Amino acid sequence: MQINEKHLLIGNVRWVRSPNHGGYLENKEPDTIVIHYTAGSSAESSVRSLCSEKSKASAHLVIGRDGSIFQLVPFNMIAWHAGQSSHEETGRRGLNKFSIGIELDNAGLLTKQSENSYLSWFGKSYPANEVLAATHRNQQTEKFWHLYTEEQLTACLEVCRILSAHYPIKFVLGHEEISPGRKVDPGPAFPLEKLREKVLDTDRSDDDETDFTMFKSEHTLKVNIDRLNIRTGPGVSHSLARTNPLTEGDSVKVLRKDGKWIQVEVDGLVGWVNGKYLR
């Protein structure tokens, strides 16, 4: 993919023009990328909403769960994605004037219905292997979040690198960082710090793409330590998924990876363990 003289992404990208935009960005080019989730049921429904004049909202890009990409607004024009927003480091207010908005198709915050059913605000249920239990950076209690797919995270990273090569991108931010208390996207299921590092750090000699995408591997490993706690999220700060730990020799089905932590399924329970204790 590449960006043409009309500030459109060329390649396997669908152009769907949104009427919801302002004039040119400050300096007529962006220096910031803002990541969002759609909180919608599909990429297509979110594109329709962002292209409806009634919504008074838009974004430059929407990335589907299969990695498909839609562009709605040229990159040199103001899209209406950030709303009331500010950036402490630069002192800016109204980030729409400086940024490219990228929406990823994701249901967002979910409500637990049972051990294997989590409900979105629009009524769709998701299984436990598509859910992360985690505490948001701006909150105090653990909640349930829809996971992103490997395909859309890979597409997001590729697009952000293309944007960074074409424009003087200095900042990669989450909506939750520029509108804290008002917005929670892209949420703890999105590897925001890793994206920032991989887009803004020009030294890629030791790059590991799977470290960003948290790929699904779906194979079986065994516990190689006497006792191994299984937690509700990737880290010791998360609560135990069950009180009795796994024991040496127990088999677990690997679902996905987040750094050194691995999401596993065992006896119908989905949780997270430290990967160094699996073989």
Where do the language-model regions lie?
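Acidic/histidine-rich, metal-coordinating catalytic segments
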Residues: 166-182
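SH3/SH3-like beta-barrel fold
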Residues: 249, 262-266
